[in-house]
Amino acid sequence: MGAPLSTTRRGMGQNLSVPNPLGFFPDHQLDPLFRANSSSPDWDFNKNKDNWPMANKVGVGGYGPGFTPPHGGLLGWSPQAQGVLTTLPADPPPASTNRRSGRKPTPVSPPLRDTHPQAMQWNSTQFHQALLDPRVRALYFPAGGSSSETQNPAPTIASLTSSIFLKTGGPATNMDNITSGLLGPLLVLQAVCFLLTKILTIPQSLDSWWTSLNFLGGTPGCPGQNSQSPTSNHLPTSCPPTCPGYRWMCLRRFIIFLFILLLCLIFLLVLVDYQGMLPVCPPLPGSTTTSTGPCKTCTTLAQGTSMFPSCCCSKPSDGNCTCIPIPSSWALGKYLWEWASARFSWLSLLVQFVQWCVGLSPTVWLLVIWMIWYWGPNLCSILSPFIPLLPIFCYLWVSI
């Protein structure tokens, strides 16, 4: 009988040269046909072998309970594939959501020098000048950050310039200032429009009053109607352009406008004279027209700062100049009064009359008040057209 192909035959499970994935070879050994006993190294001890991939490492019970092939097989080489159970740590419970615990505060933004260090390397002069503004500094260095020195907190009130162009998230503007700033001009505009409409009715009212003086029984119809220019019945104060009385109405209105303008000029002149803005020299006593040389008009200024003179000079016949101070108020009025008193001696009696009126008893004043009350309606009808001018005069008197 021939000798066997291999003299040495290893026991069961001793030959590890051939992989046994399915566990069909209990002794882990093949027939000599596969040259298992050759001089080639064992498979299990070959360093260049390819281990089983991780995909074959299935968990415990992948092929049913209690079935674990030897050496892992297709189930892999993990402890679970060998039938060894390990206890895995349980996952921590999920954190509570924001809906249950509430919104967490937003973390403070880090300074610019930490998040954008390249911006700190910019040596532009304009950039550093802009950082001098606390509002700009608060944008680049939040949460108390600073570039090199102590920073002031950003202001919470918008300035007048920044309130015009507001940014999103900027401080709210003060609506009280805006409301008060708009309410004043609106009230002034309303008052001006009201006075303008009233002033425009002054010529018509005065025209009616002027016409009524010619007709004591009442204002009749316009007498300017004729057959050549037939017009409807109307008052003489509202003649149409086709009426012959239209030119007379325009003439009366023009005279009324001149009268109102003269009244305003007189009021302005009185106001300026009251403020001392008319440096009119009073009548100089002892002045003569035969002087050999002129005298200075003014020597000093009022209080050293006023642009109006405070005294006037006169030169008598002997050639010496005499200075007379100008009144600080009512200079023109006093000049006119002294000039009129020098030519009309009876005007001096008015001074005594005024002084006498001041010393009247209360009974006389009550009598005067009763007369005004009795004749008041007629006086009001005459003076009513001038009532709209009263607020204007009062405003000018107070402002100037």
Swiss-Prot record:
Region listing for Pre-S2, in residue ranges = 120-174
The record's subcellular locations are: Virion membrane
Q: Which UniProt keywords apply?
A: Acetylation, Caveolin-mediated endocytosis of virus by host, Fusion of virus membrane with host endosomal membrane, Fusion of virus membrane with host membrane, Glycoprotein, Host-virus interaction, Lipoprotein, Membrane, Myristate, Transmembrane, Transmembrane helix, Viral attachment to host cell, Viral envelope protein, Viral penetration into host cytoplasm, Virion, Virus endocytosis by host, Virus entry into host cell
What is the name attached to this protein's record? Answer: Large envelope protein
Task: Region Pre-S1: list its residue ranges.
Answer: 2-119
Instruction: State the domain notes.
Output: The large envelope protein is synthesized with the pre-S region at the cytosolic side of the endoplasmic reticulum and, hence will be within the virion after budding. Therefore the pre-S region is not N-glycosylated. Later a post-translational translocation of N-terminal pre-S and TM1 domains occur in about 50% of proteins at the virion surface. These molecules change their topology by an unknown mechanism, resulting in exposure of pre-S region at virion surface.
Q: Where is this region: Pre-S?
A: 2-174
